Amino acid sequence: MKSIELVLALVLSAIIAGYIISYLISLNRVEPKEITFHAVEEILVNLNNFKEFSLPSRALVEVKPATLVLNGIEVNASQVLLMWKSEENVVLQGAYKGEAWSLWANNSYIGVISWIAIQDNGVELKIVFFTSSEKELKHISYSSSKVVFRGAFRNLRVSFNGIKVCEVEGFRKVLVEEISIKG
């Protein structure tokens, strides 16, 4: 009889502990504040100009794995999504528009998603992508970059997550850097 009571006490204790843990986890979940579409457009301009600035409210940060392809050579990269609750019902795919960042929205949230930045001086092609270890940000700053790939190519084709980003004729040294976004 005592073994049944012990088993029941253990099961009951486990159920209670599970409820307490799930409650504590929900307390730590950060819900972003709502933000206007216009405010996100201003954030986009600052990000595309690589400025350090304060955000109007805390943004949730999500980092997604991505693939950078240089003439068939795959380089592991990432995309950073900064998002807030949306006041408007907007859906934007976050398509690549030739800049490092683009607008993104899904009816509930609105934000910006990173792509890659490319600088070509005719000799060296520098490609930058972004990452972050933060869960949320109130301020945008950039840490020093980390070189993740060096190479040299003739007639280079660059794609990012399956999207053709650029094609360069002639010989280029290529440098791929990862820049971390901090708060």
Mark where each language-model region is.
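N-terminal single-pass transmembrane signal-anchor helix
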Residues: M1-N28
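Serine/threonine-rich low-complexity intrinsically disordered regions
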Residues: K2-S3, E31-T36, P56, N76, ...
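Aromatic-residue detector
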Residues: V11-S13, R29, V40, F171-V174
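An almost-null, non-specific background feature
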Residues: S13-Y19, K33, N49, E136
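N-terminal exported-region signature
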Residues: S22, E177-I181
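Membrane-proximal N-terminal amphipathic helix
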Residues: S26-S57
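Short, structured protein-protein interaction patches enriched in aromatics and acidic/basic residues
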Residues: L55-N76
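Intrinsically disordered, low-complexity regions enriched in Pro/Ser/Thr/Gly and acidic residues
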Residues: N71-K173, K182
